[in-house]
């Protein structure tokens, strides 16, 4: 999963991440929305306005250059760096939004995020993504060239090519602590400090395959015949990133939203909005 990277959170494949932080200040904090692949601030304007109205907090939209191209062409780790730089430039966030201090993060909400990966090239329709998707279908997805040139390749996990995935994929296996020799205990420690993890899956999802990846479910290694629920995966059983610890502590919430990938329905707003509202005078919110 990419979730534990919330301390330096960035855009990922067509989904939004909402992070909430704690502070001793008694004023409301602004929130930040990072865009997914092919999205622009203009396309998400209504979404942000509704959240602003419901939460009473000001929202910021973060674009990484021409987001349509950057989200597809720039490796995810580089997007992380760009996103952090953008946030640091916003004076309004200096006292209430911390991308580095994971201890300040309270709730993590993933809206249709491919937490366990995707089994193949994304089914996207806008021109540049469609062309690159065709490229992914023609060339080795774990080659150095593709991994450095096509961002979605960084979280493609082909169940029948696990060895190649672990050796060649430049983001997801590191993010999910799947490589035994490269596991980082800090990722697990920080992710385990979350107060709540909210995972939203779209019921008619076709962009992310399998759609259960939004709930950390995935195919077993070597097969696409069945989909394992989150608690039967290696990531959960070995608690590679702290998901099991959060679940056993009652801190994981699974939600379904109607429609296709990131369908901005009333149901989606109803799921998200309560987490954007203050629960006490000492709890404030930042969203990424």
Role assignments for model-derived ranges:
Residues 37-39, 66-68, 104, 113-117, ...:
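Solvent-exposed loop/turn segments at secondary-structure junctions
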Residues 25-26, 91-94, 102, 190-193, ...:
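Extracellular/periplasmic catalytic domains that process cell-envelope and extracellular macromolecules
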Residues 24-66:
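Short, surface-exposed "cap/lid" segments of acyl-processing enzymes
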Residues 184-288:
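C-terminal catalytic-base region of ester-bond hydrolases, centering on the histidine
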Residues 147-211:
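Serine-hydrolase catalytic core
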Residues 68-80:
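Catalytic nucleophile-loop/oxyanion-hole region of alpha/beta-hydrolase
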Residues 29-31, 35, 77-167, 207:
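Serine-dependent carboxylesterase/thioesterase catalytic core
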């Amino acid at each position: 999963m990419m979730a534990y990277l919330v301390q330096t959170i960035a855009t990922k494949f067509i989904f939004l991440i909402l992070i909430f932080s704690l502070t001793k200040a008694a004023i409301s904090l602004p929130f930040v929305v990072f865009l997914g692949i092919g999205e622009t601030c203009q396309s998400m304007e209504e979404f942000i306005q509704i959240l602003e109205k419901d939460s009473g907090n000001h929202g910021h939209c973060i674009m990484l250059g021409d987001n349509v191209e950057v989200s597809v062409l720039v490796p995810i780790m580089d997007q992380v760096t760009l996103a952090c730089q953008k946030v640091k430039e916003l004076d309004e966030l200096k006292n209430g939004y911390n991308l580095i201090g994971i201890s300040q993060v309270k709730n993590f909400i993933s809206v249709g995020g491919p937490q366990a990966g995707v089994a193949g090239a994304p089914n996207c329709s806008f021109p540049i993504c469609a062309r690159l998707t065709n490229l992914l279908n023609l060339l080795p997805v774990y080659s150095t060239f593709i991994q450095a040139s096509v961002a979605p390749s960084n979280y493609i996990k082909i169940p029948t090519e696990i060895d190649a995935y672990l050796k060649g994929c430049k983001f997801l296996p590191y993010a999910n602590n799947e490589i035994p020799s490269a596991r980082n205990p800090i990722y697990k420690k920080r992710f385990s400090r979350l107060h709540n993890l909210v995972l939203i899956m779209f019921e008619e999802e076709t962009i992310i395959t399998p759609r259960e990846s939004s709930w950390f479910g995935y195919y077993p290694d070597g097969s696409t015949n069945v989909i394992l629920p989150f608690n039967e995966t290696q990531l959960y059983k070995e608690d590679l990133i702290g998901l099991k610890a959060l679940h056993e502590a009652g801190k994981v919430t699974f939600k379904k939203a109607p429609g296709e990938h990131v369908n901005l329905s009333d149901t989606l707003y109803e799921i998200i909005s309560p987490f954007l509202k203050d629960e006490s005078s000492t709890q404030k919110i930042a969203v990424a």
